UniProtKB/Swiss-Prot annotation:
Assembly and interaction partners: Part of the 50S ribosomal subunit.
Source domain of life: Eukaryota
Record protein name field: Large ribosomal subunit protein uL23cz/uL23cy
Main location: plastid
Function: Binds to 23S rRNA.
Assigned keywords, A-Z: Chloroplast, Plastid, Ribonucleoprotein, Ribosomal protein, RNA-binding, rRNA-binding
Species per Swiss-Prot/TrEMBL record: Pelargonium hortorum (Common geranium)
Xref: PANTHER family: 60S RIBOSOMAL PROTEIN L23A
Cellular compartments per GO CC: chloroplast; ribonucleoprotein complex; ribosome
UniProt GO MF annotations: mRNA binding; rRNA binding; structural constituent of ribosome
Length: 89
């Protein structure tokens, strides 16, 4: 699970859970197939679609923060990630 950093809990990601879509921040160098295989292996679910976008790093007074990648993962109907649902409720 080196590629997945953490689950994202925002207003939009909470709305997407009802559509069986989960949002994760991942390492920017990870590929879509790596992330898909990690999610399927770790959570025991079937992934049918993945959307990703790269969020830019931000400038700071001293240096900058690194950019990262956000994945919205859609699961097959009947599958869910219960640990994230319990976190949200």
């Amino acid at each position: 699970m080196d590629g997945i950093k953490y689950a994202v809990v925002t207003d939009k990601s909470l709305r997407l859970v009802s559509k069986n879509q989960y949002t994760f921040n991942v390492e920017s160098g990870s590929t879509r197939t790596e992330i898909k295989s990690w999610v399927e292996l770790f959570f025991g679910v079937k992934v049918i679609a993945m959307n990703s976008h790269r969020l830019p790093g931000k400038r700071r007074r001293m240096g900058h923060t690194m950019h990262y990648r956000r994945m919205i993962i859609t699961l097959q109907p009947g599958y869910s990630i219960p640990s994230l649902i319990n976190l949200i409720i």
